[in-house]
Amino acid sequence: MLNGKILFSLFISSIILLSTASYANSSEVSKTINDQNMKNTEEIPIKFNRIIITGNCPFGVIMANDLAYKHVVGVGPWAFLHSNMKLLKDMKPDIDRITTDFINKDYVVNMESLLNLQPDIIYYYGKSQNDNLERAGIPTINLDAGGDTKFEPVVTQTYWENEFNQTLGLPHSHKFSDAWKRSLNEAKPYAEKIKSQHIRALYLEQSDGKELKVSGPKTYGDTYLKMAGMENVASDLVVKGDAGRYINVSMEQIIQWDPDVVFVVFGSAKDILNNKNPGQDWHNIKAFKDGKIFSTPVGLHNWGGLSAETALLPLFMINKFNPDYITDAELKVATRLHYKKVFDYEIPDALLTDELRQR
């Protein structure tokens, strides 16, 4: 029987192979435009001049392609709601031109407002974001790759990058596949060490003082923990549908799990460590006693979702669990490199420090 290390190596290898296969099969554009001859990309005409994206996660991918980004006129409000706007405006000084007003406060598309934007193409993610968009009478593209991609971030982001390039008539690129390869290769030896220690982690999607929602099995959160070599304490929970990936649990359930480390996505690790959330008492949980409760960083979006920076999340998790494995300085170097390679952006020291601080 294969031992744990071999199984983990196969897990990482399969992720990298899947991402490579995903973009290798999408070479229609690259047949006519050589990736290595990109000096005159500004002259390449785009098929659609006014782009709308209803979801927040794919927006981070299109931001990495200036040829496409400059044509985005509307995006879902979550794209900015959970962003570090200081960083976003530093990278994209024109970001204020992009509106979110075509989506109402109840997250339903306002068709009149949408049509006023005169879009040429609309991208959405999954049935829950469709909202009868065909009423607009223009091309609509579903960015849901289907199947198990709901918990495969590498394949999903690679698919989005390919889909944007193909539908907009842009050159083939593989920035996000490459980013995941860099991160997973750097994380691998340390993730294997952590795996041998059987570290039990909780991926706390939401902790707002009212609800506690966690990532169960076959979710992005579950995958991120595995990438860092950790075991998901909520792996036995039942996941149902898109919304089912966020599972409500009680404080008593978390006490019973007694995780070694907790990663907080939408919420504040500081509030938990200071016991500021009403109805929650974390005192007897190992992660609390050891001070191992951390907020996922917020950059262009929250790293803990599926953002433009999520490829860095396994490195962040390893760094927080044991800074002797990946130091704070090494995490900063990796983050700088990511922004440079994916966005051609030099992040200022102050913004990088702010992004990685505990919330």
Protein language model regions, located:
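Bacterial N-terminal signal peptides that target proteins for export
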Residues: 1-10
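Bacterial N-terminal signal peptides
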Residues: 9-19
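Sec-dependent signal peptide cleavage junction
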Residues: 20-27
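Short helix-initiation/N-cap motifs at beta->coil->alpha
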Residues: 37-38, 96-111, 238-251
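Structural recognition of the beta-strand scaffold that forms the well-ordered cores
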Residues: 52-54, 73-76, 121-125, 140-144, ...
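Alpha-helical, coiled-coil/dimerization segments enriched in small aliphatic residues
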Residues: 216-244
